[in-house]
Regions:
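Short, charged/polar "capping" segments at the starts of alpha-helices
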Residues: 23-31
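Conserved GNAT-fold acetyl-CoA-binding loop/helix
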Residues: 103-117
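Structured helix-beta-strand junction loops
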Residues: 13, 76-77, 126
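Ser/Thr/Asn(+Pro)-rich, low-complexity disordered segments
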Residues: 1-5
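Conserved GNAT acetyl-CoA-binding A-motif
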Residues: 11-23
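A short helix-loop-beta-strand connector motif used in the catalytic cores of GNAT acetyltransferases and
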Residues: 121-131
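Aromatic (often tryptophan-rich) hydrophobic motifs at membrane interfaces
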Residues: 130-171
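Acyltransferase donor/substrate-recognition loop-hinge adjacent to the catalytic core
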Residues: 34-105
Length: 171
């Protein structure tokens, strides 16, 4: 049984949504589980796939607004970036709690929060990478994800507190 299936079986047997790119891993997944899942091409989401170098360097007109947000954030705040590790899980958890407390309730966000809590609880058993933005000792944004293969990294979650909207571009 896949890990995602174990998690979803706890949630009233809901079927998971799995985002996948083309390639070897998707072909492998279809070969193993294709009869149990539907596969849908989600064209509106295609613009959320970025080359690593593009996001690392933010070169060109396309990324001007991201550069502006980062500059504005840097002017307003003395901040640092910390890689996700056991020492900052509690800070990330506090940020998560504050973000969800400030967000109107809906079932999908409740499930999202449960997923984040599960991952933070099992962090040391999972191969996730991520980080957080710290301002004044407080986590104001966080992100984490997993490597799909050597060429693709999937950002699973990205949150920034409402008082720090530019932190989305920073994180």
């Amino acid at each position: 049984q896949l890990g995602i299936e174990k998690i979803c079986s706890i949630e009233h047997n809901n079927a998971p949504t799995i985002w996948a790119a083309e390639g070897e891993r998707l072909d492998e997944f279809i070969a193993l589980y294709g009869d149990r899942y539907s596969f849908v091409e989600d064209v509106p989401s295609f613009d959320y796939v970025y080359p690593t170098e593009a996001l690392s360097n933010l070169v060109g007109k396309k990324y001007q607004s991201k550069r502006n947000h980062i500059s504005a954030f840097t002017r307003k705040h003395d901040w640092s970036y910390k890689c996700l590790d056991g020492s900052n899980i509690s800070l990330i958890r506090e940020c998560m709690e504050e973000w969800y407390a400030d967000t109107p309730y809906c079932e999908s966000l409740c499930k999202e929060k449960q997923g984040i809590e599960y991952i933070l609880d099992k962090y040391d058993q999972m191969d996730i990478k991520g980080g957080c933005v710290i301002v004044g000792g407080k986590c104001v944004a966080f992100t984490f994800g997993v490597a799909i293969n050597t060429d693709i990294f999937d950002i699973c979650i990205e949150k920034a507190l409402p008082d720090y909207p530019e932190a989305y571009s920073v994180i």
